Amino acid sequence: MNIRGMKKTIVIALTLMCNSMAFAQKAETIESIVSNSHEPEWYGQQAEAWQKIVDADPKDEWAWRNLLRAADYYVMFNHGYGKSWEEQDKTRPADVIRKMEAAIPDSYVLNLCKCRFSLSADSVAARRGDFARRAVELMPEDACAEDVNYLACRMWITDPDSPLVKELFTRSYRNRYYPARIMHFNRNMLMCMQQDAIYFANGDLDTAPMKMIQEALGERTDVTIINVSFLHADSFMKALYKRLGIKPLDINVQDYGQYGEDWYKHYEADIMMYLIKESKRPAYFSPTNPKTTIIDKDSIYNEGLILKYSPKQYDNFAVAMHNVKEVYDLEYLAEPDLVYDTWHTSGQTDLNHVTLLMNLISKFKKKGDDAQAEHLYNILSKCVERSTIFAEPEGKEAMLKGLKEQLEAKK
């Protein structure tokens, strides 16, 4: 190689090295994967970036908070935690917690992080909610909105009757943590349920926002919200049985070994069916709840944006059409000046409306309600047209074509 070529190679190599170092050193706030997710490698790089900040200032609580979150997500997405406490205690997040205990003992961030990740020695205290309560006691006025929401959920699970549940969810509502579009979706589901219903949620986006509406606004507090993961929490279940006025179910997880790694799905399904039958209350499921196929898919009916359990057949399309005309607020899907928030799940939530409601366009046509069919078509098609989550334009075109076919269906 000649000297000029060698110099060029060295310059390129140094440039790449500097860019790589700059990228690796840039620490960013680690957000919940519900709002903004990344590849595992990104979390690994962020863990290294936050580690440097912690090393420089071991008293920096914000740095510790982000270090634990980055390390936790990296392990979670990369190879998981294994099946035993012994394996979990050997992971990097466990090491972060131990070092945090020495650097910032009994701090707000330490207790917050112990809610998210427990060492085997802390597992009982974590289940009791000890760390959540202590974190709330130490929580600063300017606490991160995401962390306030997380502590509200932890208190709801571990001490459902505590006044802190209402206080924290109200604070989270005022923080405007969840985007308005996700709040709209949850309110639509909440408002269409029958009196004293029980509602089985699946994830963060169809649980906490609905509870927030109940606690902060006082709307539809007659509905009992149950995230399926809460079925494993003793404190939550004890309060739930009391609220529903039924005896606790005598159930043992050891009896579900025959299902292998899917044991928890059948365990949760059996508890849900017990709650439905014993309480004799109307039962609903979020549209993303996979447990409905285990319970009895022939007894699950779509009522628009929500699923209802019914052992008897009924005209669920009539209910869904009523919800669209009289209950749901869908106008926000077609707002002309909409600017999407930064949550990647907001666009997905919008398209859930399209998937769940598009077949009602032809139903309205067949009923002779052309105006409502046209109105629903316009809302849903505008929602699809401006969506930014399609990987390929063909996907958007196919969905728009499907909507058009619904509108042009013969009566």
Describe these PLM feature segments.
Residues Q25-Q195, E215-K411:
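ER/secretory pathway lumenal C-terminal domains and tails of membrane proteins involved
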Residues F200-D204, V228-S229:
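Short His-Asn-centered micro-motif
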Residues M212:
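Substrate-binding cleft/loops of secretory-pathway carbohydrate-active enzymes
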Residues R4-G5, A180, A201, N352:
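Residue-level detector of secondary-structure boundary/capping sites
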Residues M1-T29:
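Bacterial Sec-dependent N-terminal signal peptides
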Residues A208-P209:
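Phosphate- and divalent-cation-binding pockets in alpha/beta enzyme and binding domains
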